[in-house]
A protein has these predicted regions:
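A compositional/structural signature for long, glycine/proline-rich flexible linkers
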Residues: 1-222
Length: 222
């Protein structure tokens, strides 16, 4: 769609890679070693990207929703019935502050999925939140946060991460399956999250209630 930036998340491999990507992207290794760190470990991998309120006040994150167990209330589950044990999306501050303004987990996020299986998650500050960025209008929302969390830092910086935990061996479209930077789309397909920059809340509010998600999906790259 015109004037909409659609950015995919990228796979996390190690801490050095993240710092290099942020400050010296031309030095980023083409085949970084997967050593984990921060939220990445033997059972969890994630993807990430950066946001800035300087460039947009309202973002929408979307991907096809992986199958996860519904057992928040103690329901029993069968491991063969899901793609991964747990998935979540969180916003964050700077690498040093390591703040986490907000998160949403799979059972909450699944409520925003339409009949195509895609979820719609609005990311903004509370004061920028569109009036229709609600569960009643068919979408989820999380707080973007108030900057990088550093003294004299940027009040507009934010990061977003998507976590996959205990992925089923038969599911081949998770962050675990990405072995090289730049292969995320090829590997993850519809499960690769994209962040759409809608810039301001009026543009999202124009999608109505219930939110016309077909117009959001039309903003994604072909």
């Amino acid at each position: 769609a015109k004037n909409v930036e659609a950015r995919p998340l990228q796979a996390f491999f190690n801490r050095k890679q993240v710092v290099t990507d942020l400050f010296f992207p031309w030095l980023t290794a083409k085949a970084p070693e997967q050593v984990g760190g921060w939220w990445s470990n033997k059972v969890t991998r994630y993807g990430y990207t950066y946001l800035s309120r300087n460039f947009g006040q309202v973002y929408v994150m979307t991907a096809k929703m992986p199958r996860t167990p519904k057992n928040w209330h103690g329901e029993k589950d069968n491991p063969s019935d899901y793609d991964m044990r747990y998935a979540s999306i969180c916003t964050g501050g700077s690498l040093t502050a390591a703040s986490t303004p907000d998160c949403i987990y799979d059972e909450q996020l699944a409520a925003s999925a339409d009949d195509t299986g895609r979820y719609a998650l609005v990311i903004s500050r509370q004061e920028d939140r569109p009036g229709n960025a609600t569960a009643q209008c068919g979408v989820a929302w999380i707080d973007m946060g108030n900057g990088d969390g550093m003294v004299s830092g940027s009040p507009h910086f934010a990061s977003v991460i998507n976590r996959h935990t205990q992925v089923h061996a038969d599911f081949k479209h998770s962050w675990f399956a990405v072995t090289q930077p730049g292969t995320e789309k090829e590997t993850m397909g519809e499960y690769l999250p994209y962040v759409l920059n809608l810039k301001e809340k009026a543009r999202f509010e124009a999608l109505g209630c219930p939110v016309d998600k077909s117009k959001l999906w039309a903003m994604l790259p072909k």
